[in-house]
Amino acid sequence: MSKEWIEVSIIVSSEAVEAVSGILYNTEVEGISIEDTKDIEFKKKHPGDWDYFDESLLKVEEGAVIKAYYRESESFYGYLKYIRHNINNLENLGIDKGKGLVVVNKVNEEDWENGWKKYYKPYRAGEKIVIKPLWEEYENKKQDIVVEIDPGMAFGTGTHETTKMCIKALEKYVRPESNVFDIGTGSGILAIAASKLGAKEVTAVDLDPVAVESALKNISYNNIKNIKVFHGNLMEGVHGKADILVINIIADVILSLTEEVKKFLVSEGIFISSGIIIDRKEEVVENLQNNGFCIREINEDGEWVCIVSTIK
């Protein structure tokens, strides 16, 4: 018998996406998906450039739809109250919440886990890296590096702008001697990409046990032996120093970790930070510079930013 999950759909402004994501990550959320209508308009005009999105979102005229998934439990309704309260409080923080609508539905686990798979096809995420779902065929081209993925319930299919920018940065900076830390690994896609690009050793960390399990499975699918995966909160479980440290989460997390990141990077080590909405680019750049980082490059894709920096 299929299990049922609770799906919380939240309709807010594009400006509020990052804040709402932060609210959700303070609960026992098992999975989050985000669709921005600005992205949807682009996808309607460029139907060949994307792999999956929910056509029901076309009914949303503006803003973004954030879907969060929870197991049925006694604590869920406490979380729901917390979510609604904090979304309503966004205006007091100077953030336009848009509609601020919260809708709750029950979804079948099989529908959630497998219904999207027919839309998820092999996808070129960088110049070399190609993301291939396990169940799809792909004919390798010269110099292709194929990453086999079954994201399951973990965040990280490789199609999001922030993931693609991180992969392109890894393609540019990973060297054979590189030791790479992937903080908030999700499905493990960035850790696997780093390993396949030739990194000597990779450490991946995630707070979500579902993500840790997903990452371990995906690592095994790719027959990789040099990735260590830890269950922990952000920098917990990380030891030693990295040549490259990548975080693809949200701006607030990056802002809170910038000073600590320095302790885990070698001299002139590379910090790849993404998950940053474009409106907060300058805030993150200033914070990095104030903490002794030199900005190497800033890349933008849609409403998202990836910043590559190094210790001065």
From Swiss-Prot:
Cysteines joined through disulfide linkages: none
Organism taxonomic ancestry: Bacteria, Bacillati, Bacillota, Clostridia, Eubacteriales
EC number: 2.1.1.-
Protein name (database record): Ribosomal protein L11 methyltransferase
Molecular functions (GO terms): protein-lysine N-methyltransferase activity
Summary of the function given for this chain in its UniProt record: Methylates ribosomal protein L11.
Alphabetically ordered keywords of this record: Cytoplasm, Methyltransferase, S-adenosyl-L-methionine, Transferase
InterPro entries: Ribosomal_L11_MeTrfase_PrmA, Ribosomal_PrmA_MeTrfase, SAM-dependent_MTases_sf
Family recorded in the similarity comment: Belongs to the methyltransferase superfamily. PrmA family.
Family annotation (Gene3D superfamilies): Vaccinia Virus protein VP39
Subcellular location(s) per record: Cytoplasm
Name of the top EC class for this enzyme: transferase
SUPFAM superfamilies: S-adenosyl-L-methionine-dependent methyltransferases
Species name: Clostridium kluyveri (strain ATCC 8527 / DSM 555 / NBRC 12016 / NCIMB 10680 / K1)
Reactions catalysed: L-lysyl-[protein] + 3 S-adenosyl-L-methionine = N(6),N(6),N(6)-trimethyl-L-lysyl-[protein] + 3 S-adenosyl-L-homocysteine + 3 H(+)
